[in-house]
Amino acid sequence: MASELIEQKLALLPSQPGSYQMKDKNGKIIYVGKAKNLKNRVRSYFKAEHTGKTAELVANIHDFEFIVTNSDKEAFLLENTLIKRYRPYFNIRLKFSGSYPYIEITNERDPRLILANTLKHDHGTYFGPYPNVYAASETLHFLEMTYPLRRCNGYQGRPCLYYSMGQCLGACWRTVPQEEYQKNIDAITRFLNGETGKAISDIKKKMKRASDSTEYELAADFRDRLKFIDQTVESQRVLQNDHTPRDLFNFYMDKGWMTIEIFFLRQGRLLRQQKETLALADSVKEELESYIQQFYSQKNAQKPKEVLVPKNVDTKLLAETLEIPVRTPVRGEKRDLLKLAAKNARITLEDKFRLMELNEEKTTGAMKEITDALKIPHGYRFEAFDHSNTQGSNYVSALVVFEDGLPNKNLYRRYKLRTPTGQDEAKATFEVITRRYTRLRDEGQMYPDLILMDGGEIQLHSAEAALRKLDIDIPVAAMVKNDKHQTADLLNSRGENLFLDPHSQGFYLLQRIQDEVHRFVITFHRQLRTKTNLSSRLDEIAGIGPKSRVKLMRRFGSLPKIADASIEDIEALGIGEKVATLVKVSVSAMVKSENKKIIAKRKFEKE
């Protein structure tokens, strides 16, 4: 049931297009949507029954805001802008790899054919993307043999090896006329646009001439080129006599989840496919339209000449915002491909459900055991902290993030503590919690469902104090270890030790989180200690000032690497020959001394 505040705001909603932003109890935006009629759309969240992720969204809405726009198109574009800005938890979060390769004809006096990972504004001509590096490399190799441009590094006064093999036009030893380059560039362009007839005809003629001249090895080479075209181009054709670059989107939805399948059609072929499975927080139509809009707003996204979508999608609105034709095929090959994409999406989603059933007990089920023990709402994201120091110096903290029971290492963070703490765990905790959640608050990012502190009551209460000062409400618990430094108890905010069955998945997850945050902070502390030790040892060498010390640390990183470097390598950093020689001799002596100590220690341990 909607709160009094929400009921009052619902009554004020206009019947106009716009974007709406749902907020949680901390005032953070958790969902952004668009509407042709704000009044009808926003009211639907609170005046109807919902299931799945939509029900979870509504349960977390404590307030909302809206922005009226002049048109549906403006609302669509505004929604996309706000999603990118706030990254709301309940909106689709795209996972593009951006790693598909392209073939580029470079914009140079003597052009080359190269593989490119991204599209650049360098006036080169790009073809692709290709499904993988192997496919792109094979095509590139075929073109280099059939329609050579430049493969060498440029003029060197003599023909290069590639020229003698017929794979370079000779920029290595002569000025190649632009007409020669253009002839082959035109042929390459035709081939990569799917016009293979001319290439097949040319190669067949060359193969016949080679065979008639009894150059059977050369004839076999031409035969292999024909086989390449047949296997990689013609046999993969799914649209006959249609070379228009198209992207095709379809979906399958079940149990509050949706899988989106994308087919990339180039030169009449299904070049590659991409799929993504998402929990629905809105209608399928709204989610799919939002996904497509976000898809083409990503960095390096290449728009095709046309986009194909299933029925009930607002093709007119998408076409206006994407500024390319968007349509729904109703018959023929394109309609068949749309059905094929839906079939693939269904298989993907059904496979996901089977995997979810297998993994739920170990992941989300384990998280639920922990939240149930703490008597807090079930969540999907835990953040854990630990500290490390050397007798009060080099004090560091580290954060690990577990989502749905699994570590998300992209979200891990390391902190050098700024305030003097000595060995005061409370001060260290207060600082790192303040820094972490001030940033999340200021950037409008999603808070975790639970904070776990490695330690006991000191760390727990200090974390709670920091959150109270920030006026942020996040549950906190502590992971307590026994005298054998093993996970023993879960401590709640009231200082109570909560029992978790040591054989349960929840206890096992707690162990993994505690071990992971400890590993991460210790690794960081060792790196920092090594760096500090290196810095102090370099300070012992006469003639090495702060600037030279920093250069040596950045370039080599450790004493053994400096000892292995030549005097010339050290001089290359802008250090004079006399000081460079002194550095080499001094550091070599230090390393030799350290090695003797290590050998003596090992010998002692063996005895």
UniProtKB/Swiss-Prot annotation:
Gene3D superfamilies: 5' to 3' exonuclease, C-terminal subdomain, GIY-YIG endonuclease, UvrC, RNAse H endonuclease domain. One of its GO terms (molecular function) is excinuclease ABC activity. Residues 197-232 form the UVR domain. It is found in: Cytoplasm. The keyword Nucleotidyltransferase does not apply. One of its GO terms (cellular component) is cytoplasm. The keyword Cell membrane does not apply. InterPro entries: GIY-YIG_endonuc, GIY-YIG_endonuc_sf, GIY-YIG_UvrC_Cho, RuvA_2-like, UVR_dom, UVR_dom_sf, UvrABC_protein_C, UvrC. Its main location: cytoplasm. GO terms for biological process: nucleotide-excision repair; SOS response. Keywords: Cytoplasm, DNA damage, DNA excision, DNA repair, Excision nuclease, SOS response. Residues 15-92 form the GIY-YIG domain. The UvrABC repair system catalyzes the recognition and processing of DNA lesions. UvrC both incises the 5' and 3' sides of the lesion. The N-terminal half is responsible for the 3' incision and the C-terminal half is responsible for the 5' incision. Belongs to the UvrC family. NCBIfam families: uvrC. Interacts with UvrB in an incision complex. This is UvrABC system protein C. The lineage of its organism: Bacteria, Bacillati, Bacillota, Bacilli, Lactobacillales. The gene is uvrC.
